[in-house]
Amino acid sequence: MDGSGEQLGGGGPTSSEQIMKTGAFLLQGFIQDRAGRMAGETPELTLEQPPQDASTKKLSECLRRIGDELDSNMELQRMIADVDTDSPREVFFRVAADMFADGNFNWGRVVALFYFASKLVLKALCTKVPELIRTIMGWTLDFLRERLLVWIQDQGGWDGLLSYFGTPTWQTVTIFVAGVLTASLTIWKKMG
């Protein structure tokens, strides 16, 4: 930061380029963290990590804590385990679209999207389909760019995530995120 609220080398915190760059970094870090907890070292996920500023470290920690809470939601884990990954692209985009179908955007839903993407990546790791990993990450970033970018810009960039999750308790947040993802998976199963 140069004191003006602008981040060096990518426009301000609400520029499309900076939001996508930060989003890609957060998604990669989130997926690597989830995979590392499940499978230990995952060379398929070893990606170049740019240096983190204090804000990005806080965002990463926020996502990690929410992910830890979601991992302990057994109903959500059961539903995700039941997702058929024979056509993962269709599954991903249908669930992602269902999460935002009502036109109401919020940080809980963005985190739910990241969490769902991480679970699909972990399934790909378990089924030894490593080429699917980068593909799922690409789908997530495409969805972010096409459907969520303007909303994230309107929230002041990724720092809005910290403001959103700074007030309620973690249990409240994770119950909300788990509810969004569970509802989306339920709708997807009924339609599929």
UniProtKB/Swiss-Prot annotation:
UniProt motif BH1: location: 98-118
N-acetylmethionine: modified positions: 1
UniProt GO cellular component terms: BAK complex; BAX complex; Bcl-2 family protein complex; cell periphery; cytoplasm; cytosol; endoplasmic reticulum; endoplasmic reticulum membrane
Biological processes per GO annotation: apoptotic mitochondrial changes; apoptotic process; apoptotic process involved in blood vessel morphogenesis; apoptotic process involved in embryonic digit morphogenesis; apoptotic process involved in mammary gland involution; apoptotic signaling pathway; B cell apoptotic process; B cell homeostasis
Expressing tissues: Expressed in a wide variety of tissues, with highest levels in the testis and ovary.
Cross-link Glycyl lysine isopeptide (Lys-Gly) (interchain with G-Cter in ubiquitin) residue location(s): 128, 190
Transmembrane feature ranges: 172-192
Location of the motif BH3: 59-73
Keywords carried by this UniProt record: Acetylation, Apoptosis, Cytoplasm, Isopeptide bond, Membrane, Mitochondrion, Mitochondrion outer membrane, Nucleus, Transmembrane, Transmembrane helix, Ubl conjugation
Motif (BH2): 150-165
Keyword Membrane: yes
Pfam families: Bcl-2
GO MF term set: BH domain binding; BH3 domain binding; channel activity; heat shock protein binding; Hsp70 protein binding; identical protein binding; lipid binding; protein heterodimerization activity
Modification after translation (UniProt): Ubiquitinated in the absence of XRCC6/Ku70. Ubiquitinated on Lys-128 and Lys-190. 'Lys-63'-linked polyubiquitin chains on Lys-128 are removed by USP12.
Domain of life, source organism: Eukaryota
Keyword Transmembrane helix attributed: yes
Gene3D superfamilies in UniProt: Blc2-like (1.10.437.10)
Family affiliation: Belongs to the Bcl-2 family.
Subunit structure: Homodimer. Forms higher oligomers under stress conditions. Forms heterooligomers with BAK. Interacts with BCL2L11. Interaction with BCL2L11 promotes BAX oligomerization and association with mitochondrial membranes, with subsequent release of cytochrome c. Forms heterodimers with BCL2, E1B 19K protein, BCL2L1 isoform Bcl-X(L), BCL2L2, MCL1 and A1. Interacts with SH3GLB1. Interacts with SFN and YWHAZ; the interaction occurs in the cytoplasm. Under stress conditions, JNK-mediated phosphorylation of SFN and YWHAZ, releases BAX to mitochondria.
Role played: Accelerates programmed cell death by binding to, and antagonizing the apoptosis repressor BCL2 or its adenovirus homolog E1B 19k protein. Under stress conditions, undergoes a conformation change that causes translocation to the mitochondrion membrane, leading to the release of cytochrome c that then triggers apoptosis. Promotes activation of CASP3, and thereby apoptosis.
Domain remark in the UniProt entry: Intact BH3 motif is required by BIK, BID, BAK, BAD and BAX for their pro-apoptotic activity and for their interaction with anti-apoptotic members of the Bcl-2 family.
Name of protein: Apoptosis regulator BAX
Taxonomic path: Eukaryota, Metazoa, Chordata, Craniata, Vertebrata
